[in-house]
Amino acid sequence: MSDRDNLAALAYGPTRRQLIAGVAIAFGGLALGSPEARAEAEDGISRTAESIHQEALIKASRKRVYDALTDTKQFDKVIQLSGVMKSMPPRGTPSEISREVGGAFTLFGGYITGRHVELVPNQRIVQAWRTGGWDPGVYSIVKFELVEQGSGTKIAFDQAGFPKGAAEDLAAGWKAHYWEPLQKLLT
């Protein structure tokens, strides 16, 4: 299977092995994760089996939504509207986002970090994504699928490969810190 096939598989329902392969591609072939995480891949047992699916309707074009998610200045406005930085210790700039496949991003003052696995302008964003509270080397895969719906954009969002027990907090965070501020910013 080529690297391109691995990336395509990641975007459409990844298995644990595909997640690890895709993240390794995104990070230039580095071995990621703890020894336990690497053992999971070898023994085929997933300890990060949970996933999240959410949909949000944003009253804006796909281009405006894509730009808000991939442009540093736009995403800084999302962060400001979320209010989350008020409750966090100062950690530097709100966000820094590369707009290239393989490029890094740092969000919410460094609390969220990762790399872009796939960028299809105005259609799809796939990222290797992590919070600062996770064990070193643990990344989830997030996918934002942007679908035109009437005069707005439906974001079909999926996240897989995160630590067990994190689903509830992550799901609430996506709503409070992404979908609601995006709606405020773009309408």
Language model regions located:
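N-terminal secretory signal peptides
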Residues: M1-P14
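Hydrophobic ligand-binding cavity/cleft-lining segments
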Residues: A11-Y12, A21-G92
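Intrinsic-disorder/low-complexity, polar/charged segments enriched in Ser/Thr/Lys/Arg/Asp/Glu/Gln
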Residues: A49-E55, R62, A104, Y111, ...
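Hydrophobic pocket/interface hotspot
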Residues: V65-Y66, F75, F105, H116, ...
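Hydrophobic-ligand binding "helix-grip"
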Residues: T106-G150, A160
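A short acidic/glycine-rich loop-to-helix N-cap element
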Residues: F157-H177
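Short amphipathic alpha-helical signal-transduction/dimerization elements
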Residues: Y178-T187
